[in-house]
Amino acid sequence: MYRAVTRQIEVTVEPNFLPEKSSVADGRWFWSYTVVITNTGEDTVKLRSRHWIITDGVGRQQEVRGEGVVGEQPVLAPGERFEYTSGVPLTTASGFMAGSYQMESASGEQFDIAVPAFSLDSPDGGKRVLN
């Protein structure tokens, strides 16, 4: 599990390789990742947007920006948490992701919180096994 804390908001990420959605022969690898955002502070916050940088195994980068996460802009009161699962395809057997969420406090202040960089690894490293 990967973890980052910014302004008393904890973000943890757990990636999971999905062999059933991946195909070495087609050069396609797929991972899910589960994110848990926990508000350990004293102020209510709202997740406004996301920013991801996805890097594949040969260094190609893709930048993704958008409103909310999985179609939602969750509001987290003190002590509350929000969990979601999403997915990412790559054309290499490994890579990594990192990013941030833009949050808004109840008073309207906007600020970014870190999403920890996390590794996307396939168990076989993308190698074909010949019998």
Curated annotation (Swiss-Prot):
| Biological processes per GO annotation | error-free translesion synthesis
Question: Which PANTHER family does this entry report, sorted A to Z?
Answer: F-BOX ONLY PROTEIN 3, POLYMERASE DELTA-INTERACTING PROTEIN 2
| Organism whose genome encodes this protein | Bradyrhizobium sp. (strain BTAi1 / ATCC BAA-1182)
Q: The ApaG domain covers which part of the protein?
A: 3-127
User: InterPro entries under this entry?
Assistant: ApaG_domain (IPR007474), ApaG_sf (IPR036767), Uncharacterised_ApaG (IPR023065)
Q: What is the disulfide pattern of this chain?
A: none
Q: What is this protein called?
A: Protein ApaG
